[in-house]
Amino acid sequence: MHQVKSFLLLAIDGEKMVVVNVGSCIGCRRCERSCPINGITFNEFPIKCMHCDRNPCLYACPENAIERINNKVVVIKDKCVGCGLCALACPFGAIRIDGVAIKCNGCYKRDVEICKEVCPTGAINNLEEILNNKIQNTVNKFNKLYYLYANAK
Protein backbone atom coordinates (compact mmCIF):
# COMPACT_ATOMS: atom_id res chain seq x y z
CA MET A 1 0.00 0.00 0.00
CA HIS A 2 1.13 3.53 -0.66
CA GLN A 3 0.19 6.97 0.54
CA VAL A 4 -1.03 9.21 -2.25
CA LYS A 5 -0.70 12.98 -2.57
CA SER A 6 -2.83 15.00 -0.20
CA PHE A 7 -5.78 16.96 -1.54
CA LEU A 8 -9.55 16.93 -1.31
CA LEU A 9 -11.87 15.90 -4.09
CA LEU A 10 -15.22 17.58 -3.51
CA ALA A 11 -18.61 17.32 -5.15
CA ILE A 12 -21.94 18.75 -4.17
CA ASP A 13 -24.63 16.16 -3.49
CA GLY A 14 -27.88 18.03 -2.99
CA GLU A 15 -27.65 19.21 0.60
CA LYS A 16 -24.42 17.41 1.46
CA MET A 17 -20.97 17.44 0.01
CA VAL A 18 -19.13 14.16 -0.48
CA VAL A 19 -15.43 14.31 0.25
CA VAL A 20 -12.68 11.93 -0.73
CA ASN A 21 -9.65 12.96 1.28
CA VAL A 22 -7.00 11.60 -1.00
CA GLY A 23 -4.29 12.40 1.53
CA SER A 24 -5.93 10.01 3.99
CA CYS A 25 -6.38 7.26 1.41
CA ILE A 26 -3.84 4.49 2.00
CA GLY A 27 -4.70 2.60 -1.17
CA CYS A 28 -6.13 -0.46 0.61
CA ARG A 29 -9.01 -0.62 -1.91
CA ARG A 30 -11.52 -1.80 0.70
CA CYS A 31 -14.05 0.65 -0.72
CA GLU A 32 -13.69 -0.88 -4.17
CA ARG A 33 -13.85 -4.48 -2.93
CA SER A 34 -16.81 -3.87 -0.63
CA CYS A 35 -19.04 -2.27 -3.26
CA PRO A 36 -21.79 -4.81 -3.99
CA ILE A 37 -22.30 -3.51 -7.53
CA ASN A 38 -18.63 -2.84 -8.42
CA GLY A 39 -19.50 0.84 -8.66
CA ILE A 40 -16.17 2.17 -7.40
CA THR A 41 -13.04 2.16 -9.49
CA PHE A 42 -9.63 2.80 -8.04
CA ASN A 43 -6.97 4.79 -9.82
CA GLU A 44 -4.58 6.19 -7.20
CA PHE A 45 -7.71 7.05 -5.19
CA PRO A 46 -11.36 5.93 -5.20
CA ILE A 47 -13.49 7.20 -8.05
CA LYS A 48 -17.18 6.97 -7.25
CA CYS A 49 -20.37 8.68 -8.25
CA MET A 50 -20.85 11.97 -6.46
CA HIS A 51 -24.63 11.93 -7.09
CA CYS A 52 -24.48 15.45 -8.50
CA ASP A 53 -27.37 17.79 -7.96
CA ARG A 54 -27.52 18.52 -11.68
CA ASN A 55 -26.84 14.85 -12.59
CA PRO A 56 -25.78 15.26 -16.23
CA CYS A 57 -25.73 11.49 -16.70
CA LEU A 58 -29.46 11.33 -16.00
CA TYR A 59 -30.24 13.90 -18.67
CA ALA A 60 -27.84 12.32 -21.17
CA CYS A 61 -29.54 8.92 -21.01
CA PRO A 62 -31.92 8.48 -23.97
CA GLU A 63 -33.56 5.43 -22.37
CA ASN A 64 -34.38 7.04 -19.00
CA ALA A 65 -32.35 4.28 -17.40
CA ILE A 66 -30.93 6.60 -14.75
CA GLU A 67 -33.16 7.80 -11.95
CA ARG A 68 -32.78 9.71 -8.71
CA ILE A 69 -33.88 7.47 -5.84
CA ASN A 70 -33.49 8.53 -2.20
CA ASN A 71 -31.35 11.46 -3.41
CA LYS A 72 -28.96 9.05 -5.15
CA VAL A 73 -28.41 8.68 -8.89
CA VAL A 74 -29.14 5.05 -9.77
CA VAL A 75 -28.85 3.06 -13.02
CA ILE A 76 -31.90 0.91 -13.77
CA LYS A 77 -30.08 -1.96 -15.47
CA ASP A 78 -33.21 -3.39 -17.12
CA LYS A 79 -33.62 -0.15 -19.08
CA CYS A 80 -29.95 0.49 -19.88
CA VAL A 81 -28.82 -0.29 -23.44
CA GLY A 82 -25.14 0.46 -22.78
CA CYS A 83 -24.86 3.38 -25.21
CA GLY A 84 -22.31 5.15 -23.01
CA LEU A 85 -23.77 8.65 -23.21
CA CYS A 86 -24.03 8.79 -19.43
CA ALA A 87 -20.33 7.93 -19.11
CA LEU A 88 -19.46 10.74 -21.50
CA ALA A 89 -21.61 13.18 -19.52
CA CYS A 90 -20.22 12.26 -16.09
CA PRO A 91 -17.86 15.03 -14.94
CA PHE A 92 -16.09 12.66 -12.52
CA GLY A 93 -15.48 9.71 -14.83
CA ALA A 94 -17.40 7.56 -12.39
CA ILE A 95 -19.43 5.58 -14.93
CA ARG A 96 -18.06 2.73 -16.99
CA ILE A 97 -19.80 0.60 -19.58
CA ASP A 98 -19.65 -3.18 -19.44
CA GLY A 99 -22.71 -4.15 -21.45
CA VAL A 100 -24.65 -1.71 -19.27
CA ALA A 101 -23.68 1.36 -17.27
CA ILE A 102 -21.95 0.55 -14.00
CA LYS A 103 -21.67 3.20 -11.31
CA CYS A 104 -21.97 3.70 -7.59
CA ASN A 105 -25.61 3.76 -6.53
CA GLY A 106 -24.81 5.38 -3.20
CA CYS A 107 -26.15 2.31 -1.40
CA TYR A 108 -29.50 4.05 -1.80
CA LYS A 109 -31.30 1.33 0.17
CA ARG A 110 -29.02 1.79 3.19
CA ASP A 111 -28.54 4.58 5.73
CA VAL A 112 -24.75 4.65 5.28
CA GLU A 113 -22.73 3.82 2.19
CA ILE A 114 -20.71 0.62 2.61
CA CYS A 115 -17.52 2.26 1.30
CA LYS A 116 -17.72 4.80 4.14
CA GLU A 117 -18.19 2.04 6.70
CA VAL A 118 -15.21 -0.02 5.56
CA CYS A 119 -12.72 2.80 4.96
CA PRO A 120 -10.13 2.42 7.75
CA THR A 121 -8.97 6.04 7.55
CA GLY A 122 -12.28 7.81 6.92
CA ALA A 123 -11.04 9.06 3.55
CA ILE A 124 -14.57 8.80 2.13
CA ASN A 125 -16.92 10.86 4.22
CA ASN A 126 -19.52 13.61 4.24
CA LEU A 127 -18.24 17.14 4.62
CA GLU A 128 -20.88 17.75 7.29
CA GLU A 129 -19.40 14.99 9.48
CA ILE A 130 -15.85 16.23 8.92
CA LEU A 131 -16.79 19.82 9.79
CA ASN A 132 -18.72 18.74 12.89
CA ASN A 133 -15.68 16.79 14.08
CA LYS A 134 -13.41 19.78 13.44
CA ILE A 135 -15.79 22.09 15.29
CA GLN A 136 -15.97 19.70 18.24
CA ASN A 137 -12.17 19.40 18.34
CA THR A 138 -11.85 23.20 18.31
CA VAL A 139 -14.41 23.55 21.12
CA ASN A 140 -12.52 20.93 23.14
CA LYS A 141 -9.25 22.83 22.67
CA PHE A 142 -10.84 26.09 23.80
CA ASN A 143 -12.36 24.36 26.81
CA LYS A 144 -8.93 23.04 27.80
CA LEU A 145 -7.38 26.49 27.35
CA TYR A 146 -10.15 28.10 29.39
CA TYR A 147 -9.70 25.50 32.13
CA LEU A 148 -5.94 26.12 32.21
CA TYR A 149 -6.47 29.89 32.26
CA ALA A 150 -9.17 29.75 34.95
CA ASN A 151 -7.07 27.50 37.19
CA ALA A 152 -3.88 29.51 36.72
CA LYS A 153 -5.23 32.35 38.87
UniProtKB/Swiss-Prot annotation:
Residue positions binding [4Fe-4S] cluster 1: C25, C28, C31, C119
Cofactor: [4Fe-4S] cluster
Pfam families noted in UniProt: Fer4 (PF00037), Fer4_11 (PF13247)
Binding-site residues, [4Fe-4S] cluster 4: C61, C80, C83, C86
Positions of [4Fe-4S] cluster 3 binding: C49, C52, C57, C90
Single GO molecular function: 4 iron, 4 sulfur cluster binding
Residues binding [4Fe-4S] cluster 2: C35, C104, C107, C115
Keyword field: 4Fe-4S, Electron transport, Iron, Iron-sulfur, Metal-binding, Repeat, Transport
Top-level taxon of origin: Archaea
Cofactor binding annotation: Binds 4 [4Fe-4S] clusters.
Domain 4Fe-4S ferredoxin-type: 16-45, 40-71, 71-100, 95-129
Record-linked PANTHER family: DIMETHYLSULFOXIDE REDUCTASE CHAIN B, OXIDOREDUCTASE
Protein name: Uncharacterized protein MJ0264
